[in-house]
Amino acid sequence: MELAGKNAVVTGASSGIGAATVRKLREAGVRVAAGARRVERVDADVSLPLDVTDEASSTAFVEAAVAELGGIDILFNNAGLALGRVPFEDSTEDVEATVLHTNVDGVLRITRLCLPHVRDGGHIVFMGSIAGRQAYPHGASYIASKFAVRGFSYALREDLLGRPIRVTTVDAGLVETEFSLVRFGWDEEKADAVYEGLDPVTPDEVADCVLFALTRPLHVNLDEIVIKALAQSSGARVVRRDSA
């Protein structure tokens, strides 16, 4: 399916997968309204401030996006984060609340606000994670949030069945973005260690998966795409090259 002339809304668009997807959508002729807290880093046709954890910010974002675009053909729910890698007993409610409000409440909120404006033939894409398919140690809040996103995508597809709106989740493993920097409080040494000794997936490669789903024929729904580095079989199992 051709994307030229379509309208897209993208969250979490200031870096990484979000920024790469915005770029590739625009290269395909899509007009993109994109948002992030660091709006100065967003490069889209319409760049808007957005905090998905804040109802007023989210409402203003969607209203402005729809006013500029006139309707939505593609929604990419990409905003999300993880904080820390500690056993659950060492986690705090503040950290858990931040992760769940961003990754779960924010996704539901943006979807609810956008859905009335999604046109026939539209497509809603969720940025999931292999953490939403199989747990690993010391990541309870993030894992719970991504299982929730996967469950919501299933439920939304059931609710939209019979309407010409497709729903896809892209579940990624290790992708070299600012994700690990955020997770470890901008500790570059800890973040770099996540990707040491292997070739991680790149943001462009995940964006390619998003566009692959979007460009299938309208009668085809790719429910899920799982993308991982060759060296990773699950969230907890990674084979690294010997640094020696």
State where each predicted segment sits.
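Conserved glycine-rich cofactor-binding loop
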Residues: N7, S14-S15
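The beta1-alpha1 cofactor-binding region of Rossmann-like NAD(H)/NADP(H)-dependent oxidoreductases
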Residues: L50-A60, E93
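Substrate-binding pocket helix/loop in short-chain dehydrogenase/reductase
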Residues: V86-F88, V95-T98
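Active-site helix of classical SDR
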Residues: T111, S145
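Alpha-helical segment proximal to the catalytic Tyr-Lys
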Residues: P116, E158-L161
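Residue(s) in the substrate-gating loop at a strand-loop-helix junction
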Residues: S129
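C-terminal helical subdomain
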Residues: T169-V170, E188-A236
